[in-house]
């Protein structure tokens, strides 16, 4: 589609100083000169247990009590960056599954974008949606709105 073509052209222009497809400014400010130190820094990182899961449960419980029907957007991590920092795919999968399970427990409708970890230009930095990511989000929001 034309939107995707435009998104890719803009992304290429804005990510020209690094091999991770991240915004030039972000990469320069937060990673560039520290790149080598980032390699394998997350080798022991795990989200098997995290207090943030309880925070998510509280949010979903409030939604249930107030009869709010949210669309929970489950954003992926940046796959290539996570690999570089040593946050292994199996541990990311465990994290994704934990979040999915919590959403299912509360009957929360979810836009699961976690399958796009390696999609070029889906993320604009290590954790935020990028050009293709926002297109996927926009399409889902439109569908969600008209489906209510």
PLM segments and residue spans:
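Generic detector of short, locally flexible boundary/turn motifs and exposed helical patches
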Residues: 34-39, 74-77, 100
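Generic alpha-helix detector with strongest preference for long hydrophobic helices that associate
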Residues: 4-11, 15, 37-40, 44, ...
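Long, positively charged, glycine-interspersed low-complexity recognition regions
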Residues: 82-148
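Secreted/periplasmic serine-hydrolase-like ester/acetyl group-modifying domain
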Residues: 1-66
């Amino acid at each position: 589609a034309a939107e995707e073509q435009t998104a890719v052209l803009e992304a290429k222009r804005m990510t020209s100083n690094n091999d991770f497809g991240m915004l030039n400014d972000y990469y320069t400010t937060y990673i560039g000169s520290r790149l080598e130190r980032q390699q394998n820094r997350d080798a022991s990182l795990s989200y098997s247990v995290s207090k943030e899961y309880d925070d998510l449960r509280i949010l979903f419980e409030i939604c249930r009590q107030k009869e709010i029907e949210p669309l929970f957007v489950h954003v992926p991590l940046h796959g290539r960056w996570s690999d570089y920092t040593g946050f292994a795919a199996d541990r990311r999968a465990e994290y994704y599954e934990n979040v999915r399970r919590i959403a299912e427990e509360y009957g929360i409708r979810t836009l699961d974008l976690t399958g796009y970890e390696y999609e070029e230009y889906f993320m604009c930095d290590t954790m935020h949606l990028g050009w293709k990511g926002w297109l996927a989000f926009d399409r889902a929001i439109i569908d969600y709105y008209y489906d209510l």
